[in-house]
């Protein structure tokens, strides 16, 4: 999960690990990498879960799910490098569904075609703004992850997310909880799968990637 220090991505992923551990038979672990000047700097959250206890934290090199919470990152990082064949890629973008694939640099398009990656998009900032959440897209992206990952049945996942919201924000007032609930429900309506074509649709290459 690629995010920014101020967008709530790390906090949402910590909540996701708790939900997975509490609601399934799986063990979960999070490993978080971010700049010391966290606010405004890139963060990368590595989530692992499975039926056996996970002992040692490390970076994920074979990912079945990759999420980009900030659209500008498509030109800054090799987001799909760790993705395995058949992985799922979730992108926060303001591009309409029919133009989302075209907006990607050539390297990403080629990787998606070669690895047969499933592609989902959501305009998380629009959903957050319309729900009264400002720029905090964490709830929106967390909902999208659970909706398409299959870690939990969707209805169970939504109920678990809302329960976590009540625990996290309940003391801050009913209005904040309600706004988060609205963001969860709106996320499902604004999440779309994009058909990946058989050939690239651009010649635009990504600038040199930041390692």
Name what the model sees in each region:
Residues 2-211:
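Active-site cofactor/cluster-binding pocket
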């Amino acid at each position: 999960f690629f995010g920014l220090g101020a967008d709530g991505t790390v906090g949402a992923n910590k909540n996701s690990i708790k939900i997975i551990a509490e609601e399934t038979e799986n063990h979960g672990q999070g490993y978080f990498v971010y700049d010391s000047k966290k606010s405004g700097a890139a963060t990368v959250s590595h989530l692992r879960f499975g039926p056996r206890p996970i002992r040692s934290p490390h970076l994920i090199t074979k990912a079945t799910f990759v999420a980009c919470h900030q659209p500008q990152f498509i030109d800054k990082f090799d987001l799909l490098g760790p993705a395995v064949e058949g992985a799922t890629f979730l992108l926060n973008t303001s591009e309409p569904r029919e133009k989302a694939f075209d907006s990607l640099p050539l390297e990403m398009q080629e990787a998606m075609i070669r690895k047969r990656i499933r592609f989902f998009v959501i305009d998380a900032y629009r959903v957050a703004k319309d729900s009264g959440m400002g720029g905090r897209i964490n709830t929106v992206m967390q909902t999208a992850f659970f909706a398409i990952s299959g870690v939990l049945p969707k209805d169970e996942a939504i109920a678990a997310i809302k329960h976590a919201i009540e625990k996290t924000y309940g003391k801050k007032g009913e209005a904040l909880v309600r706004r988060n609930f609205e963001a969860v429900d709106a996320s499902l309506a604004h999440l779309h799968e994009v058909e990946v074509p058989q050939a690239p649709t651009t010649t635009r290459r990504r600038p040199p990637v930041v390692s």
